[in-house]
A protein has these predicted regions:
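Membrane-embedded alpha-helical bundles of multi-pass transporters/translocases
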Residues: 2-463
Length: 463
């Protein structure tokens, strides 16, 4: 026999309101890298541009190449004490602050100093990706119905986007405090350590909130029940290649992240060379970040009325229309800010929808293959994210090159050709990506709410 702990049914009030505080702190922590890693390498550590390029490229390529592996490992190894996924919310996060801090510490100008930064960057990402994937996997574990999964995904997205607002007020003052204590060069190392500690604490909060939601089975000698949550490499491959909705969703997710990263990266060029008022960027970021939070929070209400799939499709198409309209009125800065802010509101909705859609593909995969590949499929969400980051530089650089951009150009003398090239990256290409996302879901993602509920009932009937 096996000693099997009964799992809770229905979401607790804590999960409905506070699931996502770990994601909020996680994003706060990773934003130190997003906003200050290059600045640390060039201005504080004062490495040459060639060295900086080597460090960032090496770390990002390794990170991207490993992005698929975390879910596969979680699905394939023996479950830990507190469950296959929930256990990882407490096992590794405490190591992250110590590894992450060294990514922003300069030991010397030689190869040892460079090696320490690269190793710290790669190691910290490996360590935090396991709990990150486990955390997302818990949406499918705790969310027994499409409504529950939509609720969890929406709350998580709202908290994650709220971190952008917090970061804009916290990061610089915190860095200034540590600069006065340990010096300017390593100030971001201290910020990374502190925010890494906050992340570990908040992941522990998630660990506590999910208590009782994941089945924990202690096998004995007479146990004959096969663990359906443990998968072989063949099982994992089948869960992907025999899962057309998952492939369609990953394409749509990549397009979504392309929109986010490209628009974020090119915004400074728009306000500098088209609006000719770089100071507007700060206000634009505050407005769009707040609207992202609002969109994320409201997504669950839309999903209840339209279904998560339909909400995502309609949102992607609406965002594309808004971006195209912004391109036609690119010289009207106020209108562009309004339209781009509306698009970011839509991004908040789409960001909240996609984890719930991944959870639906997990149900489909188990129905199709007989194996529960929750960790593997949840971990695959990392792939569009990492590829999206890589496409950002390619798209922005290509558009600027076609527009004959030069850093020596006076913003006041920016040509129409340059302005249109910037708008191509800011509006047109993201709009095209969003149309692809909508079509991918419309054609390839045929999982309706009714079908998912039917598959769940059939899985339960199998025992």
């Amino acid at each position: 026999m096996s000693d099997e702990k009964k799992t809770k049914k229905g979401l607790s009030k804590a999960l409905k309101m506070f699931y996502g505080v770990g994601d909020c702190s996680f994003t706060l922590m990773t934003n130190v890298e997003s906003y200050f890693f290059n600045f640390f390498l060039t201005n504080l550590a004062q490495f040459g541009l060639g060295t900086v390029s080597f460090i960032t490229t090496t770390a990002s390529v390794i990170d991207a190449c490993l992005s698929w592996i975390y879910g596969a490992i979680l699905n394939s190894i023996k479950p830990k004490k507190w469950g296959r996924y929930r256990s990882w919310l407490i096992l590794l996060p405490w190591l992250v602050p110590f590894l992450y801090a060294f990514q922003f510490i300069k030991l010397n100008d030689g190869p040892v100093g460079v090696a320490v930064i690269i190793i710290a960057a790669v190691a910290s990402h490996i360590v935090w990706n396991f709990p990150y994937v486990a955390n997302v996997s818990m949406i499918a574990v705790a969310g027994k119905t499409p409504e529950d999964r939509s609720q969890l995904a929406s709350t998580r997205a709202a908290w994650a986007n709220f971190s952008k607002v917090i970061f804009s007020y916290v990061a610089t003052p915190l860095a200034a405090i540590f600069a006065g204590i340990i010096g300017e060069t390593n100030q971001y190392g201290a910020v990374a350590f502190v925010l890494g500690c906050v992340m570990a604490v908040m992941y522990y909060v998630h660990f506590r909130m999910f208590d009782g939601y994941e089945e924990i089975e202690v096998a004995t000698e007479t146990t004959e029940k096969k663990d359906k949550t443990k998968t072989s490499p063949v099982d994992l491959l089948r869960s992907l290649v025999q899962n057309p909705p998952l492939i369609a969703l990953m394409i749509a997710d990549l397009a979504k992240f392309m929109f986010n990263f490209v628009c974020a990266g090119v915004a400074v060029y728009y306000f500098t060379y088209v609006a000719k008022d770089a100071g507007m960027l700060a206000n634009y970021l505050v407005i769009t970040n707040i609207l992202c939070v609002v969109g994320s929070y409201l997504s669950k209400n839309l999903a209840k009325k339209l279904s998560t799939r339909v909400t995502a499709i309609v949102t992607f198409l609406a965002m594309a229309v808004v971006l195209i309209a912004a391109n036609f009125t690119y010289s009207n800065v106020t209108l562009v800010v309004i339209l781009m802010s509306a698009a970011q509101f839509g991004y908040g909705i789409a960001y909240a929808c996609t984890p719930a859609l991944y959870a639906d593909t997990i149900v489909y995969a188990e129905w199709k293959t007989g194996k529960n590949a929750t960790g593997w499929i949840s971990g695959l969400q990392n792939v569009p994210l990492k590829v999206g980051v890589m496409t950002r530089g390619i798209i922005i650089s290509a558009c600027l090159a076609m527009a004959n951009f030069s850093a020596d150009i006076d913003p006041a003398a920016a040509s129409v050709e340059l302005q249109k090239g910037i708008c191509m990256a800011f509006m047109v290409i993201p709009a095209c990506a969003l149309i692809v996302a909508a079509l991918s879901l419309l054609i390839g993602f045929r999982l309706t709410k009714e079908k998912v509920e039917q598959y769940q009932a059939e899985i339960a009937a199998r025992g």
